[in-house]
């Protein structure tokens, strides 16, 4: 009897969600973000589709479904970080939230939830820090600089190309750093859980792999400084 009641409640809740989703007004609204000329980093929360482009002139524009009109928070703070947030609402998809951002350089990217960041162009700079959580993803980001620092959690995925003098990668859960076309001289790496990393290293790597994590690499680097535990592994790819 108890199991039947739970099942009925689950069906009712699903029906309410589906009915609510059908009635949502998905007419598209859009607006320009003020102070876009100061953007040097992006913080994304929720199911946003972000299109990040490299360009000499900075600009930022958002497009969202009408039912989210009073729930969207998009602004640039005094430190030059563009915040893209949305208050919790049932039935949000990435088709409901879109941002187009054009900036000369990028120093910081943080994304959570189910946000996707798609990149065009080549970004150059001294340092770049990336933090991805949940099911967030970065696709086709090209970066050339001195340092890159990447932290991945949950089921996040970072797809990058480019080059750096030094790279640091920390990945947990089932996250993935898909970077075979990113070349670094030195790598500091920490992989846990079932996380995976693929990168090109030319000189040396240090760090620790645990759980069922896996590091694949190209290049002739010295990896004797990488410790292995559990079922973790290192594979050289020709």
Which ranges hold each PLM region?
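Short, surface-exposed interaction patches in beta-rich subdomains
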Residues: 158-238
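A residue-level signal for conserved active-site and pocket-lining positions in enzyme catalytic cores
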Residues: 46, 74, 109, 134, ...
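Acidic (Asp/Glu) and glycine-rich low-complexity loops/linkers
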Residues: 19-112, 116-131, 142-151, 159-167, ...
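Bacterial Sec-dependent N-terminal signal peptides
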Residues: 1-30
């Amino acid at each position: 009897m108890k199991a039947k009641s739970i099942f009925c409640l689950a069906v009712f809740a699903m029906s309410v969600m589906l009915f609510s989703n059908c009635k949502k007004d998905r007419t598209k609204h859009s607006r320009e973000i003020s102070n876009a000329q100061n953007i040097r980093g992006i913080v994304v929360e929720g199911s946003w589709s972000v299109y990040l482009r490299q360009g000499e002139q900075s600009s930022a524009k958002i497009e969202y479904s009408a039912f989210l009109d009073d729930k969207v928070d998009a602004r640039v703070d005094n430190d030059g970080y563009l915040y893209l947030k949305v208050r919790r609402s049932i039935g949000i998809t990435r088709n409901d939230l879109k941002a187009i951002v054009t900036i000369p350089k990028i120093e910081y990217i943080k994304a959570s939830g189910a946000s996707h960041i798609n990149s065009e162009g080549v970004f150059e700079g001294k340092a770049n820090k990336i933090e991805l959580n949940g099911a967030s993803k970065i696709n086709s980001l090209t970066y050339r600089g001195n340092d890159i620092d990447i932290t991945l959690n949950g089921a996040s995925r970072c797809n990058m190309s480019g080059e750096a003098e030094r790279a640091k990668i920390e990945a947990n859960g089932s996250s993935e750093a898909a970077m075979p076309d990113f070349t670094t001289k030195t790598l500091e790496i920490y992989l846990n859980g079932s996380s995976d990393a693929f990168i090109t290293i030319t000189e040396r790597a240090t760090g620790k792999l645990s759980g069922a994590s896996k590091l694949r690499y190209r290049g002739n680097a010295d990896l004797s400084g990488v410790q292995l535990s559990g079922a973790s592994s290192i594979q050289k790819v020709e």
